[in-house]
Amino acid sequence: MANYAVGDIQGCYKEFDKGLKKINFNEKKDRLWISGDLINRGPDSLKTLERIYNIRSSVNIVLGNHDLHFLARHYADRKAAKNDTLEELLSSSKCEKYAKFLLKQPFVFSKKIKLKNGDKKKYIMVHAGLPHYLTFKECMNLNKLSQEFLSKNPKKNLKKIFFHHRKNNFKIVSMKDKLTFFINAVTRIRICNKEGKIMFAFKKGLKDLPYNFIPWFKLKISALTRDDRLIFGHWAALNGKTNKQNIIGLDTGCVWGNKLTFVRLEDSKKYFIKKIK
């Protein structure tokens, strides 16, 4: 049995399928961790989601911002974005089934894994990152509440999530506002200042950091002990590089013409699938 992680498939089905073959993924024995953004912008969102759904008993998923965007388009009449490739999925007879499947998925997932050297290591998976001041217990509690919040009334609460997506302060009295901030933070964060204020609009690379802002993972992450490891996607401009041994970037920009990356968690071995032209 092995645990493999992959990030930001974004509907790049050919590369995803080739990657599963390259790692010899066995759905009866292995586990696949997907760090969000399963769909959108790539050419085969429906086919990708269908494949993941068919092996769902062998998959751990966290939601990403593109997954939320799809849910908002399906449930809350959110307008299409310029580069959306969701029409085939949205018009499919299976759309509601797949939407309900995604609504059940968490924003943060964690599990202990036995490494090849025999040690046990706790892995935490999130799409974009974690606010540095939240403890692991706080993150998992907010994750549970956020799942309940989203699934209870998808139409109303998805609108609230996207309406409040520019709020960047966790010091909010309302629990609903706190949950919408948490959801936006874990699915969108790239950079923040030393106090944890997030600049949600930033999408560039490390050479273009605004003054007094740093990558979120440069701060001491309260949820992460020195023995834990965290895996995330979302930030393609990093090309998977964080310069931190215990924080692993998975998004290597397949949808932008680069590659899809799989990581075997037991020994951190990486498998690369170049974009298929």
Where do the protein language model's features map onto the residues?
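A short acidic-Thr-Gly-centered motif at the start of a beta-strand
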Residues: 1, 24, 52-54, 109-120, ...
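N-terminal active-site segment of His-dependent metallophosphoesterases
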Residues: 1-55, 68
